[in-house]
Amino acid sequence: MARDKIGLIGSGQIGGTLAHLIGLKELGDVVMFDIADGVPQGKSLDIAQSSPVEGFDARLAGTNSYEALEGAGVCIVTAGVPRKPGMSRDDLLGINLKVMEQVGAGIRKYAPDAFVICITNPLDAMVWALQKASGLPAKKVVGMAGVLDSSRFRYFLADEFNVSVEDVTAFVLGGHGDSMVPLVKYSTVAGIPLPDLVKMGWTSQARIDEIVDRTRNGGAEIVNLLKTGSAFYAPAASAIAMAESFLRDKKRVLPCAAYLNGEFGVYDMYVGVPVVIGAKGVERIVEIELAGRDREAFDRSVAAVQGLVDACKKIAPDLLDR
């Protein structure tokens, strides 16, 4: 049986890590794309040369042409630039919007049936722009944010309680930024909700609040430590979980930036919510009940995303015609 073909658009730190994980998990053959000549070719060759040691038979190739993505069943997009000192939000949006338009056109032409996962920041705005630019069905285009943010939340909770990360479940909703909403009441340890663990004396509400804040600033914490870059191992692993659920029709319930058109009272926006990912893409949006502070926090997060999308519409109004 032919292996699935996975296109990686962007061959930086996340792109390289994605390629290696795809090989290790035998998810399919990999085509790494980048505009920088030699970079995708060199990285794909380096990873391919690890295959005899690791024992995987996935084929890897590097390219500077979108044509090589033809027939890809999954495309994971990391292309774009990070925000640099002195760069305004609109500067970053303007640059990465152009990238999304180019990437969207390439996917539309050569991989129109692909399941597309966007990682480029600012995430919620870029995945919205990518879907508009590609013209792909909204259920086939998602943003990777919630899996990563929830993983960070789970890790911090497991560390706090000194238990296995496997026994911790958690959901982080909303935009991918400091307005994200870690849902304490829907987070559990072996099925026991966090509020109950506070009552049992396992921790205090003050510690939970600190962990929530650390989760919101999880990406910034790593940037501050690295000084010359940002996270790439955990973001790549998070995107792989999404791709694997699609390729293997696992129907996992994962928090992703998904297109909402009425769900949660949100229209024509990508916002982080729980979804079921299977062979058809986003097969269901899990519209959990939000009330009180959680609803207020979610609405604030949606408003922050709306601000980014509105800025995109002003910078690239032609996207609205697609």
Swiss-Prot record:
UniProt EC number: 1.1.1.37
Record field: catalytic activity: (S)-malate + NAD(+) = oxaloacetate + NADH + H(+)
Coiled-coil annotated residue ranges, if any: none
Positions of substrate binding: R83, R89, N121, R152
A matching Pfam family: Ldh_1_N
Annotated NAD(+) binding sites: G10, S11, G12, Q13, I14, G15, D34, N96, I119, T120, N121
One Gene Ontology term of the molecular function aspect: L-lactate dehydrogenase activity
GO biological process, one term: lactate metabolic process
Keywords for this protein: NAD, Oxidoreductase, Tricarboxylic acid cycle
Catalytic site: H176
Top enzyme class: oxidoreductase
Gene3D superfamilies the UniProt entry points to: Lactate dehydrogenase/glycoside hydrolase, family 4, C-terminal (3.90.110.10), NAD(P)-binding Rossmann-like Domain (3.40.50.720)
NCBIfam families according to UniProt: MalateDH_bact, PRK06223.1
Purpose: Catalyzes the reversible oxidation of malate to oxaloacetate.
Protein family: Belongs to the LDH/MDH superfamily. MDH type 3 family.
Protein name: Malate dehydrogenase
Organism per entry: Nitrobacter winogradskyi (strain ATCC 25391 / DSM 10237 / CIP 104748 / NCIMB 11846 / Nb-255)
